[in-house]
Amino acid sequence: MTFENTLHFAQQLDRNDPLRSFRDRFLIPQAGGKELIYFCGNSLGLQPKAAREALDRELTVWQHLAVEGWFMRPDQAEDTPWLSIHKRCKDPLAQIVGALPSEVVPMNNLTVNMHLMLTSFYRPAGQRTKILTIGGDFPSDQYALETHIQARGMNPADVLVEIFPREGESAWRGEDICNAIDTHRDTLALVLMSGLHYYTGQVFDMAAIARKALQAGVPVGFDLAHAIGNIPLWLHDWQVDFAFWCSYKYLNSGPGGVSGVFIHQKHHNANLPRLAGWWGYDEDSRFAMTKGFVPMAGADGWQLSTPTVLAMAVHHAALQITAEAGMDALRRKSEQLTAYLEFVLRNSGYPLEIMTPADPAGRGCQLSLLVHQDGKRLFNRLVEQGIIGDWREPDCIRLAPTPLYNTFEEVWHVGQILLKFRT
């Protein structure tokens, strides 16, 4: 498509958008009675209108049934009781990440789940002790890896194999990651990295990485914090061993919302080491309170504690929206929306560098802009104009037009404001 930098063109794209009605399902932040241009779904997604209703339903159950809410619903409501509330989320989660329902479960928060997955899938033996990852991954992932390795009595410097972009480049080359797996195949115990980089916005070729790890006989896992709800995933078909994510970005499940994990079906009958808790115990006999852990089938057996019912209710309401829109349709709009943002940014003539890969297949909805002079000042001026993005030190502005609720007209306005700043 040939883009035009005009309001009429942007509005025409919006009129032709098959997902345009989904914006009405979200509460758009306002200032001075005017809707803000919110390009920060990569940090915190907007509140679905259905969230409050979902919360109210569970508060009503708590009000009228109290502890019995774990086992029944008022007036035979269709929703499952709290005892099985996580099951409400399994079908939409499976659809979004390309998995079987038995392979996914919502639980905990991301870094907790990362430690749980490391416990099960990092099994150093003999000379196979190393973990291959990318250098400069999200800090919480770095801290989790370092401290988990230390807790095993090992030195992170001896264990971690970090892959960086080449000198003078901001993006990783897929062949460098795959070649590193080949190079270290005899000493690797695990490959673990983000599926989409938080800072650059780069999408990694998870299918190729998983394929190479499988050939090397090394388990592979991905942090999908910035990938889930952003790009289509086929974790089961890719033979990914495990994955984990948060839900408060593109899934719009609220600040600190419920995380989740994927564990491939091939591991469900394996006697993997795990940290267990009573909510992962076989639900048919959980309340017998007997000694000895008997896990639930599938990923459910990795649950630890009683679920956070109110957060889970919002999570389910938000997941239904994403599942209804469909990841293929969301991706089609996202590619066009982000390409149009790139177009208007370049047309503005503002002195900035887009560090996110130009290839649509190599990025999600986020563009990371390097502003080498007065970047923080530009960011603050954008906020003053009602444009909400995200600032990352030392000189990066992240803008993420999100297909569920952002418009092409909003993108056009961002370009016009930058044009005004330049002149």
What are these regions (language model features)?
Residues 1-423:
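Pyridoxal 5′-phosphate
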